[in-house]
Regions:
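SAM cofactor-binding core of SAM-dependent methyltransferases
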Residues: 21-104
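C-terminal substrate-binding/active-site "lid" region of AdoMet-derived donor-dependent transferases
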Residues: 122-163
């Protein structure tokens, strides 16, 4: 284990808890990395960078992979860029600032692994926008699809939580 990366991860976990920044936790973290391993990714696309925690995990696990990660919030984007520089990953983890709907049009594929971690209501639209840029055997992971058990519930799901 790299002590610099371990310290960065711990720092981000504390920061996320303090500032209420959603980051992947516990069992979901293991599921994400297991799903990505199935793709043996050379290129990864993450939609929803936040402060860069998931990108850091993916860059650490896949040291040869190029990663494009998209974030709409300028403060979180700046923090993610800072994290990638501190980790020594800024040459292969590219943090893009802007709305995913616009940024997806500018990206070049193919991507072997897609991680949807932005607004749940946009997942289908984002998937359709990037579908042609995925490699034939790409693996797709979507965070929060079981958000608060709503997928399993018989109750109507509020629009903003639909995927």
């Amino acid at each position: 284990m790299d002590p610099v990366l371990e310290a960065l991860k711990k720092e981000l976990e504390i920061e996320a808890g303090r500032d209420h920044v959603p980051i992947i936790r516990g069992p979901e973290r293991s599921l994400l990395l297991s799903a990505a391993e199935k793709a043996s990714p050379k290129r990864i696309l993450e939609i929803g960078t936040a402060i860069g925690y998931s990108s850091l995990l993916l860059a650490e696990r896949f040291p040869l992979a190029e990663i494009d990660t998209l974030e709409i919030d300028p403060v979180r984007h700046a923090r993610a860029e800072e994290v990638m520089r501190a980790a020594g990953f800024s040459q292969r983890v590219h943090c893009h600032l802007g709305d995913a709907a616009e940024l997806l049009e500018t990206l070049e594929g193919p991507y072997d692994f897609l991680y949807l971690d932005g607004p749940k209501g946009q997942y289908l639209r984002q998937l359709k926008a990037i579908e042609q840029k995925l490699s034939p055997h790409a693996v797709i992971a979507a965070d929060n699809v079981l958000f608060r058990g709503m997928v399993e519930s018989d109750a109507p799901v509020p629009h903003r939580y639909r995927t």
